[in-house]
Structure formats: structure tokens, C-alpha cells
Amino acid sequence: MAEPILHIEGLDKKIGSKQILKQISMDVMEGEIIGLLGPNGSGKTTLIRIIVGLLKQNSGSVTISGFQHDTEFEKAMEAVGAIVENPEFYPYLTGWENLKHFANMHKKIADERLDEVVERVGLTSAIHDKVKTYSLGMRQRLGIAQAILHRPKLLILDEPTNGLDPAGMKDFRDHIKELAEMEGTAVLFATHLLREVEDLCDRVIIIQKGEIKAEVSLQGTDQTTEKAIIEVQPQEKALNWLTGNQYQAESQDGTIVVEVAKENIPELNRSLVGQDLNVFSITPYTQSLEDEFIKATTAHQEEGEELV
């Protein structure tokens, strides 16, 4: 079995007496895009800062590309590229000069690699312009180029689409998807935007109050449903019949949600009608990421101060 690029186990962080992160554990595999989703103040940024070495955890471990954070920090960081909100550059230098300056901090980054990443992020025509003339979207693309210049195995993104218009956000997503597919880069994408996660990620980890509340796979969400919503009367009689016939069913908002393959819905409908039940509709049931997010966060709702 392949080893994860990022492995976090039992991570705790306190500031003073306040618990900021509580027993965080996760894996990110090669070529996988993982969304770290949570409201502002959920602990996402604190976790990102620990991963990139800007903060120290109280307990737990971080392993990147097989290197322990605590004992082999420099080797671990060689495998990391990061964009934290809006990337900063020297505005009086060109995009190329900024990348060249960054490349000089690493070993053996040839100009051919600079050309490659510039083309990948779509900045070829503007790379020799001064960065002060760049739009926010162009700066973000330059940020991606800088972050992947040294071929990191792990790319960390913390709210990277802040301030981008819809076209810029789509452009950004396309570049990240291509990066994961073409170079096998593992991506951890922290955001509070549901739509961004749905459009970009393979899997989402929902975090609130410093704890992981749920993990949801976003792959295969268009497959045939295994649940249906039934509007039927009398509802209690229908529910009793379903559970008595080995169906997994429950009442929900005046309807019944039942586990049933799509191809078996006509047979189920005939059976219900045969029990003198009035069936008004049977529709496929799909639970959106928004539903999952609300379910995970409201089920653990607590009073207290916000995290950072």
C-alpha cells in the first residue's frame, strides 16, 4: 500500500489554557486534492501553520514524504510548496525575476523548469512584465508557479481564492487539477467556501472548533443513488412495513428516506400500493456537501470563543 505524502496523527495545539486543535489525524495521498473545510475560526489556519513549520504542536506528529517534522524538518520542508492567502512578491521586479530569485534559494532549478511552470500556469505572455502591473489572478498564478517550482510532493493552499472573481477562481481550479494529475502533487486546500471544495477536491475533511467532525468522499457523487425519498400516507404504516421487510428507512421532514437501488424503485412502489398505501412520489435522494457540512457542524454545536 502506498505511503501518504502527508501523515498527521493525534495533533494537539494549545495557546495558553485554550485548546486550539484536538486530536487531528489525516492522510493525503499522491495526486489527491483534499479540502479542509470549516467556518472562519475553526482552526484551519493553525493547522496549516503547524504543517509548514510556523507553529509548534503540543503533541502528535506530522510526517511529510516520509520525514518526521520534529527530527528531519529541513528534509520534510523540501517536499512542501505553499500559498497562504495572497502571495507576496517584489513588485518592482518582473515575474521572471521573482521566480529566478526564489529558484536561487533551492538546488538545481534550471531555467527550463522556470519556463515549464510559467507555461503551465499560463503566464508566458506576461512573465517579463513587472509584478506591480499584475492583476490579483495573475499574482495567484505566479504564486502557484513559485510554489511548484522545486517540484514539491505536497502543496498547501490556505484560502487561495480570496479576492478572485469567478473567472479567476475557475482558472485557479483548473491549474490545481492539472498539477495533481500531471505531476502527482498531493494538495491540501483549506477554505470556508463549499463550492470551491465541490468543484476541486477528491475528498473533504470538515473541521470545527479544532476537531475533525466528518470526512466525505466527493468521488463518484454522480453514481446511481442508493436512497429514495417517499411521500406516502399513512406514513407510520408505510414505515412499519418497510422496516418489517428489511428496508433501512427513517422518517425525515414528513417523508420517508429509504435505502433502495434506483432499479428497484418501481418494484418498491408496486409493493407499497399493494399494501393499500397512497404513494404520492418516490424520488432519488442525494445529500449535498452543504447538507453534510451542516449536519456535521450543527451536531457538535458548542458555545465558546472562536479559534484561529
From Swiss-Prot:
Domain of life: Bacteria
Any coiled-coil regions, as ranges: none
Cysteine pairings via disulfide bonds: none
InterPro entries, per the entry: AAA+_ATPase, ABC_transporter-like_ATP-bd, ABC_transporter-like_CS, P-loop_NTPase
Matching Pfam families: ABC_tran
UniProt entry keywords in alphabetical sequence: ATP-binding, Nucleotide-binding, Transport
Entry GO MF terms: ATP binding; ATP hydrolysis activity
Domain ABC transporter per the UniProt entry, residue ranges: 6-234
Keyword Membrane: no
Binding-site residues, ATP: G38, P39, N40, G41, S42, G43, K44, T45
Homology family: Belongs to the ABC transporter superfamily.
Protein's UniProt name: Uncharacterized ABC transporter ATP-binding protein YdbJ
Provenance organism: Bacillus subtilis (strain 168)
Higher taxonomy: Bacteria, Bacillati, Bacillota, Bacilli, Bacillales
Gene (UniProt): ydbJ
